[in-house]
Amino acid sequence: MTIQQAFASNDAARDALTIADVRAAAARIEGAVVRTPMMHSITLSQIAGCEIWLKFENLQFTAAYKERGALNALLHLSEEQKRRGVIAASAGNHSQGLSYHGTRLGVPVTIVMPRTTPTVKVMQTESVGGKVVLEGETFDDAYAHARQLEQERGLTFVHPFDDPLVAAGQGTVGLEMLEQVPDLDCLVVPIGGGGLISGIATVAEALDPAIEVVGVQAELFPSMYARIKGKDMACGGDTLAEGIAVKAPGEFTSRIIAGLVDDILLVGEKALESAVSLLLQIEKTVVEGAGAAGLAAVLDHPARFAGKRVGLVLCGGNIDTRLLANVLLRDLARQGRLARLRIT
């Protein structure tokens, strides 16, 4: 069964989100987010056997594309909704993007996180203006509490991915990519809940249906892959790509992906680590595991992309420095460039 057969038809996917929605979002957020560069990597192209173009979304103020969708949603609020404030459940880039732009616009932002959230993530969100509430042991607990507070306090819930306004904002990444490099053959996009690839696939379908859109998930969290393929696959584990470690993908985004995305690939942890390391060594840019997923997929499936002009989204750069150091050391060891001597 193909992806297109698994869910809705292409027509239904087009109706769910349109290029007009994405263009409107682009006009709305213009000047408030960075129009990030799209650059050709000669060295990575030589390594991968295809022409690689990189979209540096890790250069946003919050180091991730997520602020695009968050801002688009914020700009749709009524004056009463702005006064009351917004709420979200997130321990990642969505919390920072929503907090930063909400605070900038004078909208109170509450973020619910599990009690197990690392202190550094709490501090990062608070540093850009968000009020953090710690509740529950898991994300599901935090999500349930956020929806409860939404009702009790009259707040507006901003979903990190399963929202047309958010997906339209994320789609502006694809709009910029195809304005900057119009003749790409393929776009390779990380998938967590599916907001980013839904927006990008909508743009690609409208501007050039011949462009192939390929999603990437971590092998440990193949939630969208399993849903689209109709398979029962376990999700869980300690992945470097925690930004796309989503157990339950969006309903809205699933319909769009089913209709417009050509393929979904899975990548393992070693491939993710190698991609993070390569981007730092060659492009001198820091990406998180999710941000390196596209490159990991291209390097893991060389025949799939051979000779093509491929656009990759470096979707985020928020990675703990100690984790990054360990990733680099492990990758050096795998390459035989690191040795340990024991003197007795």
Predicted region positions:
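PLP-dependent amino-acid enzyme catalytic core
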Residues: 1-344
